[in-house]
Amino acid sequence: MEEQIKVKKNKLKLLIVALVIVTVIVLTVTVIVPNAKVSKQIKVIKDTPIGETIEFGTYEQDETSSGKEKIEWIILTKEEDKALLVSKYVLDAYNYGDTSTGDIYWQNSSIRDWLSNSFYNEAFSNSEKSLIIDTEVTYLLDPNDQYDKVFLLSEDEVKGYFVTDDSRKCKPTSYAVSNGVTVDENGYCLWWYKNPDWSKNLAGWVDYTGEAVYRTGEFINDSNLGVRVAIWVNLKH
């Protein structure tokens, strides 16, 4: 009888040890390692000068079976404990909106929905998502606050951070070209920027020469323009 009790106690001890080991492994995989990666990412962004590039998130870019590639971002500015990043390359092709469904504003545009859902979930891990800040969207026709995690730069941002036409020129990834982005003889493409909150059926884009222009109406239905993604990231996580 005593021997049976001793065996049961030993089994219980082994079970407790096993549970402790499993708990440590789970915490390491789900908490400690992701937090360490986040801290490392924050340090990289903090240490990288404005105008230089960093890697953050992954997205298909070379159109091969090797899996997604790391996204390169240009650091546009740093404000207190956050940084504004824009993708170095055009990452995909997408239409701004479908005017056949009614008047299109940024708030109800198809490209905003795609960025906020499909792209956001495809490009970022949960730990990376924890660094991305909600950015308020002002909308004169709707008093309710709206927020974006992933967005297009505005005209003021495009012209403010890229002060010359040459600096606005952008090349797409091979994947973006395969999805319809058209390029000129030098490999540059057209890429969208966000329209003003008061305008309907009006989309901004940067052309092959780097000039920032607007077009209206059916033009915004075109899906051969590129998407250059922008995000704000938290540097005090």
Summary of predicted features, one role per range:
Residues 5-21:
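N-terminal Sec-pathway targeting helices
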Residues 39-237:
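Collagenous Gly-X-Y triple-helix signature in extracellular proteins
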Residues 1-2:
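N-terminal intrinsically disordered, acidic low-complexity segments at the extreme N-terminus
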Residues 25-47:
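Sec-dependent signal peptide cleavage junction
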